[in-house]
A protein has these predicted regions:
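Short, well-structured hydrophobic secondary-structure segments
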Residues: 1-2
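Catalytic phosphate/metal-binding cores of nucleic-acid and nucleotide-processing enzymes, i.e., regions
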Residues: 5
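Catalytic core of non-heme Fe(II) oxygenases with the double-stranded beta-helix
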Residues: 8-75, 79-80, 85, 91-95, ...
Length: 107
């Protein structure tokens, strides 16, 4: 299949989670997608949890916390609520966050 869209970055920023840092539930209000590139973290670093707009059929949960490692990228629709639990360890978790839209390419 051929991908006939351009990726247009809207915003890019870095986040460093020091001990005690966290993010409250939020979404990214523009249309499009948001992504996280995990740069530096430990297995017990704080996790990003997504709040699903539907119940998981297996366990009826609306929370999804992917197990990620450095180098992983998560991309979700910008309307999806998400948060990060507090950093309880003495290690700085580093991520690169970005928002983007897809622009169709016309031939």
């Amino acid at each position: 299949a051929k991908f006939n869209s351009k990726i247009l970055l809207q915003r890019v920023w870095s986040v460093v989670y020091n001990k005690g840092d966290y993010h409250v539930p939020h979404n990214h209000s523009s249309t499009g997608y948001c992504g996280i590139l995990y740069l530096d973290m430990k297995p017990d670093s704080p996790k990003t949890t997504y709040i699903q707009p539907w119940n998981n059929q297996e366990d009826k949960s609306v929370l999804y916390t992917p197990q990620v490692k450095p180098g992983d990228i998560m991309i979700v629709p910008q309307f999806l609520m998400h948060y990060t639990t507090p950093n309880t360890i003495n290690f700085k978790k580093r991520i690169l966050s970005f928002d983007f839209v897809l622009e169709p390419v016309l031939f």
